Structures are given as structure tokens and as C-alpha cells.
């Protein structure tokens, strides 16, 4: 029995290490399949999507993933052109999208929105970003990238730098890393440290240290995960301007890193990684984006097929 069949994907906390490893194996299988065979996995199935916040990579990644396994996609990517402008509730919109699809992807600015949608929908709901809480499919993509590029996850030193307060990818990644034996360094301005309401739960599974100085750690890291400052989540633009550009990864910083270290970023990038880093062997953020297509294809294949694929 495929334990992922019809499963909502709301939080990375809902996945054990064994389940993550099973998803990674399924992703490897997706990559290895002939494209013709791959398109049989979800042939005739439809993925619905509902984006209440802007998205380029995540939405296109899901669409490309579904197309690669033979399925179709439909939905709303510009909420201003939907019936929500007429006052339609999230619950009703979710129900309508569910009628037309076999599974649904939701991005919404409010915390708890994806879990609420899962209660309303009779089809599996996939969280593509829920307020400041989580982004579980990004974390699966990130963990898979680390494993592919470093050949393991256990016993690595991983630095996460940037906006640790508002960046939802950070929380999902930390919970995912809690399944592994890793040394995590959290590097951010004081005002953007990890939220205190999340530290207790994370510390139950993961040891980490906090710092404001990236140069204190950079030469030890196997993985540097860079995040942008989340301008849209600041209540005051003046506060944003105080921390904008706090950390910039450029060639000078790269020279201090291990030769085989890798640099990741969930994207979009603003100014936190210089473009001259892009062509170095350490830059793996575009490969990371490509892996997202395959990890999401694997998740969809597992979610929509009773016996897997």
C-alpha cells in the first residue's frame, strides 16, 4: 500500500526520515524514467492550483512537474481576476477548485490556511506556502538537493543565512533537517532571528547555534543556504531598509569557503548573492530549482496513485 496516496502535504513535520528517503528514491526514479514512460504516471489526472500570493518558480514547477508525468493543470494564479474580488470565501473557492481537480496546490498569506483548506477539500491539498509558517515541498526539494550534491545529509555543517524570522522556507527546512544528524548555524541580523515561538519545537529535534557574523562560520560550512529579506512581510519599510543587504555572498566570501561547499537559495534572489557567483562550481541554486520539478513530480505521482509508480 502506498502510504502517500491521497495524503495532504501541509507540513514537513508530518514526514518521517524514512518517508523523506522514500520520496528521494521516487524522485530518482522519476529522473531515470524515459519521458514517454514518465508521462503515464498521472495520465488523465488534473492538478488544481490557487495562488493568493505571487509565485513564479513554485507554480511553474508544479505545472511542469504535472505535465512531465502526463497530467494537466488548471487554476488561479492572479487572484485579482477571480471571484474572490466579489467576496467569495476561501472555503468556497477551495471547494470549486476541488470539483475540477484530483489534487490542489494552495499558496495563501494567512497562517493555517492550508490546513483549513485540507479540512474543506475532499481532494489532497498541497501547501505551497502558508503565511510565515511553512513551505514543505520547498524543504523536500532543498533536502534532496543537499543529498544529490553532497551524497549525504547526515554529518554535514549547514549554515542558513538571512531572514530567519519571516522566511517560511527556513522553518520547513529546519524541521526537515531535524530528521538528520547535522550541525546547523543560523546567521541573521538580531531583528531577524528565528521566532521565539518556534525555537522550543525545533530544539526538540535539532541542535543549532545562532550568530550575526557569517565570517565566524563560513570556512566550516558544507552547505550555505541563503535567503532573501522578506520585504513584503515587514510591517514598516523603514525596518526593512535597516536590514536590507545585511549579508551578500560574493567571490571574496566564497574564497573563505571549503572547496567542495555548495551554495543554495530558494529564490527569488534580490541582492544577497552576487551574480558573479553563479558560474562557480559551488553555486547550486539553479540545479536546486530544477530538482524542484522532479521532487514535486514524485510527490504528485505518489499522492495520486494508490499503488505508487
UniProtKB/Swiss-Prot annotation:
GO terms for molecular function: amino acid binding; aspartate carbamoyltransferase activity. The keyword Transferase applies. One of its GO terms (cellular component) is cytoplasm. One of its GO terms (biological process) is glutamine metabolic process. Carbamoyl phosphate binds at residues 57-58, 107, 135, 138, 267-268. Keywords: Pyrimidine biosynthesis, Transferase. It catalyses: carbamoyl phosphate + L-aspartate = N-carbamoyl-L-aspartate + phosphate + H(+). Pathway: Pyrimidine metabolism; UMP biosynthesis via de novo pathway; (S)-dihydroorotate from bicarbonate: step 2/3. It is an enzyme of class 2 (transferase). PROSITE patterns: CARBAMOYLTRANSFERASE. L-aspartate binds at residues 86, 168, 228. Its EC number is 2.1.3.2. PANTHER family: ASPARTATE CARBAMOYLTRANSFERASE (PTHR45753:SF6), ORNITHINE CARBAMOYLTRANSFERASE, MITOCHONDRIAL (PTHR45753). Heterooligomer of catalytic and regulatory chains. Belongs to the aspartate/ornithine carbamoyltransferase superfamily. ATCase family. Catalyzes the condensation of carbamoyl phosphate and aspartate to form carbamoyl aspartate and inorganic phosphate, the committed step in the de novo pyrimidine nucleotide biosynthesis pathway. This is Aspartate carbamoyltransferase catalytic subunit.
Amino acid at each position: 500500500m502506498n502510504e502517500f496516496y491521497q495524503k495532504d502535504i501541509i507540513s514537513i513535520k508530518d514526514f518521517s526520515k524514512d518517508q523523506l528517503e522514500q520520496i528521494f528514491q521516487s524522485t530518482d526514479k522519476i529522473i531515470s524514467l524515459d519521458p514517454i514512460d514518465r508521462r503515464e504516471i498521472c495520465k488523465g489526472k488534473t492538478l488544481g492550483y490557487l495562488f493568493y500570493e505571487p509565485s513564479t518558480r513554485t507554480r511553474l514547477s508544479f505545472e511542469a512537474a504535472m505535465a512531465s508525468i502526463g497530467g494537466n493543470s488548471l487554476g488561479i494564479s492572479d487572484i485579482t481576476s477571480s471571484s474572490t474580488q466579489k467576496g467569495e470565501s476561501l472555503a468556497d473557492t477551495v471547494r470549486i477548485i476541488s470539483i475540477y481537480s484530483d489534487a490542489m496546490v494552495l499558496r495563501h498569506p494567512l497562517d493555517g490556511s492550508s490546513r483549513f483548506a485540507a479540512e474543506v477539500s475532499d481532494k489532497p491539498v498541497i501547501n505551497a506556502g502558508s503565511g510565515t509558517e511553512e513551505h514543505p515541498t520547498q524543504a523536500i526539494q532543498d533536502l534532496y538537493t543537499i543529498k544529490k550534491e553532497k551524497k549525504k545529509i547526515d554529518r554535514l555543517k549547514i549554515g542558513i543565512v538571512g531572514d530567519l524570522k519571516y522566511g517560511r522556507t527556513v522553518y520547513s527546512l529546519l524541521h526537515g533537517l531535524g530528521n538528520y544528524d547535522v550541525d546547523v548555524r543560523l546567521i541573521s541580523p538580531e531583528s531577524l532571528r528565528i521566532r521565539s515561538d518556534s525555537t522550543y519545537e525545533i530544539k526538540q529535534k535539532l541542535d543549532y547555534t545562532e550568530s550575526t557574523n557569517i565570517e565566524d562560520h563560513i570556512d566550516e560550512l558544507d552547505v550555505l543556504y541563503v535567503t532573501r529579506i522578506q520585504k513584503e512581510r515587514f510591517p514598516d519599510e523603514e525596518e526593512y531598509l535597516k536590514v536590507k543587504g545585511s549579508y551578500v555572498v560574493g567571490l571574496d566570501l566564497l574564497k573563505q569557503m571549503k572547496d567542495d561547499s555548495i551554495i543554495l537559495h530558494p529564490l527569488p534572489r534580490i541582492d544577497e548573492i552576487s551574480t558573479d557567483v553563479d558560474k562557480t562550481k559551488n553555486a547550486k541554486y539553479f540545479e536546486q530549482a530544477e530538482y524542484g520539478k522532479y521532487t514535486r513530480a514524485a510527490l504528485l505521482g505518489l499522492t495520486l496513485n494508490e499503488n505508487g509508480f
